[in-house]
């Protein structure tokens, strides 16, 4: 049965697959486009399964913001070549929009969400693997919301607002403080803090750090009072490195982030950090 060009074109538009695959699927399904789509989805599953043991270490992070909530979505691929592909960029952007629209708070919720006429998001990922020829993986989602205030964010990159690292911040304020929030999010991206405040630090890790410093200071053979001041000073330096509120503001190192927040008449309630290499908070 000879297939007309309009059917082949429609099938290619709907699946993103090549001419020969679409033509063959239509021939096998007697020109029925719906059946051909299902057939190609089955082929896509098979192709994706063959790539499942590959390592997807590149990729992109996309952000989508609403007034009082926001999401960061990370999709991995194998190479920078695919990460810069327009179809991959569109896929990642669409997933962030869907996650925001559906208020997805977990990967499972997003994977099971509807994706255009492809089916679910997970099926769109599988289809993308088939079309782009690399393993694609929807690997992380960060969701942040606030009841009284705004969510602001920043993604560092140069690909249509997508990038390799992103942050969300929740601000409690009475007015529009998006620019303030964006500046804090940019700081989070640059400095990668491990906790919002000292109280939020992992206690076991904190105790271990103090023990190491105390052992280092003990070898100096200083009087007890002097040794305690040295330990406290080194701990303060440690807090500056890993605690957001204690860090020096990247735009003005004469003040801490806590000082910048106070001067801006806002309260920083929480933050999220997502990076391509897996580090996140």
UniProtKB/Swiss-Prot annotation:
> What Gene3D superfamilies does this protein map onto?
1.10.286.20, DNA helicase RuvA subunit, C-terminal domain (1.10.8.10), Elongation factor Ts, dimerisation domain (3.30.479.20)
| Alphabetical UniProt keywords | Cytoplasm, Elongation factor, Protein biosynthesis
Is Cytoplasm among this UniProt entry's keywords? yes
InterPro entries given for it? EF-Ts_dimer_sf, Transl_elong_EFTs/EF1B, Transl_elong_EFTs/EF1B_dimer, Transl_elong_Ts_CS, UBA-like_sf
Kindly list the places in or outside the cell where this protein is found, as annotated in its UniProt entry: Cytoplasm
Q: What's the family?
A: Belongs to the EF-Ts family.
Q: Please explain the role this protein plays, according to its UniProt record.
A: Associates with the EF-Tu.GDP complex and induces the exchange of GDP to GTP. It remains bound to the aminoacyl-tRNA.EF-Tu.GTP complex up to the GTP hydrolysis stage on the ribosome.
List the protein's name. Elongation factor Ts
Which species?
Wolbachia pipientis subsp. Culex pipiens (strain wPip)
Task: Tell me the lineage of the source organism.
Answer: Bacteria, Pseudomonadati, Pseudomonadota, Alphaproteobacteria, Rickettsiales
């Amino acid at each position: 049965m000879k297939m007309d060009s309009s059917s082949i074109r429609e099938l290619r538009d709907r699946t993103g697959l090549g001419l020969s695959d679409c033509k063959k699927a239509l021939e096998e399904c007697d020109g029925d486009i719906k059946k051909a789509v299902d057939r190609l989805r089955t082929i896509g599953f098979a192709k994706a399964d063959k790539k499942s043991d590959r390592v997807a270490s590149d990729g992109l992070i996309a952000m989508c913001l609403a007034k009082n909530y926001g999401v960061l979505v990370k999709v991995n691929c194998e190479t920078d070549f695919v990460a810069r592909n327009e179809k991959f960029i569109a896929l990642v952007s669409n997933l962030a929009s869907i996650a925001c629209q559906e208020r997805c708070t977990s990967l499972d919720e997003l994977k099971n969400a509807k994706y255009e006429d492809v089916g679910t998001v997970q099926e769109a990922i599988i289809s993308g693997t088939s079309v782009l020829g690399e393993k694609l993986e929807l690997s992380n989602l960060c969701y942040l919301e606030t009841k009284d205030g705004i969510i602001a964010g920043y993604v560092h990159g140069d690909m249509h607002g997508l990038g390799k690292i992103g942050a969300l911040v929740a601000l409690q304020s009475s007015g529009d403080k998006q620019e303030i929030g964006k500046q804090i999010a940019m700081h989070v991206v640059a400095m990668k803090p491990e906790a919002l405040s000292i109280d939020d630090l992992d206690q076991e890790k904190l105790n271990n750090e103090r023990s190491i410093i105390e052992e280092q200071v003990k070898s100096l053979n200083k009087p007890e009072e002097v040794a305690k001041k040295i330990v406290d000073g080194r701990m303060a330096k440690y807090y500056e490195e890993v605690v957001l509120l204690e860090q020096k503001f990247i735009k003005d190192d004469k003040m801490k982030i806590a000082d910048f927040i106070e001067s801006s008449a806002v309260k920083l309630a929480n933050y999220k950090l997502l990076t391509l290499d897996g580090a996140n908070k």
